[in-house]
């Protein structure tokens, strides 16, 4: 009986000793992991205090963004800002990204849950190769846990690159709400004041004859310009802030027409406005040819010119529509 009791006590003692010995390495590893994480967060906070958008090369990206442990998200902009890259969109996107990062850095809700970083192609081309990335600018959210999913890549062509749009995307992916605070822009008020001054000056100079205020042609032209601007998508550009065009960094080919019906470029707005203006001018010439008191020869020329403008520009407009709405069955002169 005593031997059995002695054997049981020895067994329990050995088991407890083994548990203690095995637990020591795990505790040590956990402590080391916490120290590494603390060092990474402190380093990122130090850089963020100096510059809200942290510039990273390949080594920094792999150590601070890709390698565990990590309890923070990193919003990374992959870009090409060097002058010889001739990426106009990259410059515009960088300005919006800086505004967003500054808004977060100086917000009362600022924490170490999320950081902003950028990788320039000329400083971290190995990162572009590692991620199989062939276009810039590109925004990717690297979450605190796991790998980036499909939704963690920002749809630049659809949403545009305005700071407000990127902030909404970040809120969807990280639950961090950023209130965008833009630096004051006095260009708008100055232009409005200048316009009012010009109008006031004209009214003052023509105060003895105010018939120009009742000129139907002038009001019709102003209304037509407003309609052309609105129907071309100018308001969509103002809200979404899309790029002017897209240049392929490998081939150098520039796209002025977006291939999707859900987005557009600024250049596309100008093209559509020009085509609508051409159709309108053609219709005006046709109306003048039918109602004018000019000789028959000039009226025939106006009629032919009007028909030509309507046919040509409407055909171009329809071809753009077909390129954006794939499967649209109708065309006119041009496919």
UniProtKB/Swiss-Prot annotation:
Function comment: Accessory component of the STT3B-containing form of the N-oligosaccharyl transferase (OST) complex which catalyzes the transfer of a high mannose oligosaccharide from a lipid-linked oligosaccharide donor to an asparagine residue within an Asn-X-Ser/Thr consensus motif in nascent polypeptide chains. Involved in N-glycosylation of STT3B-dependent substrates. Specifically required for the glycosylation of a subset of acceptor sites that are near cysteine residues; in this function seems to act redundantly with TUSC3.
Naturally occurring in which organism (per UniProt): Pongo abelii
Pathway membership: Protein modification; protein glycosylation
Glycosylated residue positions: 71
Occurrences of domain Thioredoxin (ranges): 47-175
Disulfide bonds: 87-90
Family statement: Belongs to the OST3/OST6 family.
Membrane topology, from the record: Multi-pass membrane protein
Gene Ontology process terms (BP): protein N-linked glycosylation via asparagine
Species classification: Eukaryota, Metazoa, Chordata, Craniata, Vertebrata
Keyword Transferase attributed: no
Tagged with keyword Hydrolase: no
Subcellular location: Cell membrane; Endoplasmic reticulum; Endoplasmic reticulum membrane
Protein name: Dolichyl-diphosphooligosaccharide--protein glycosyltransferase subunit MAGT1
Residues annotated as signal peptide: 1-29
Any single GO CC term annotated in Swiss-Prot or TrEMBL for this entry: oligosaccharyltransferase complex
Pfam families on file: OST3_OST6 (PF04756)
Extracellular topology ranges: 30-184, 231-270, 322-335
Alphabetically ordered keywords of this record: Cell membrane, Disulfide bond, Endoplasmic reticulum, Glycoprotein, Magnesium, Membrane, Signal, Transmembrane, Transmembrane helix, Transport
Topological region Cytoplasmic: 206-209, 292-300
Subunit structure: Accessory component of the STT3B-containing form of the oligosaccharyltransferase (OST) complex. OST exists in two different complex forms which contain common core subunits RPN1, RPN2, OST48, OST4, DAD1 and TMEM258, either STT3A or STT3B as catalytic subunits, and form-specific accessory subunits. OST can form stable complexes with the Sec61 complex or with both the Sec61 and TRAP complexes. The association of TUSC3 or MAGT1 with the STT3B-containing complex seems to be mutually exclusvice.
Transmembrane feature ranges: 185-205, 210-230, 271-291, 301-321
InterPro entries per record: OligosaccharylTrfase_OST3/OST6 (IPR021149), Thioredoxin-like_sf (IPR036249)
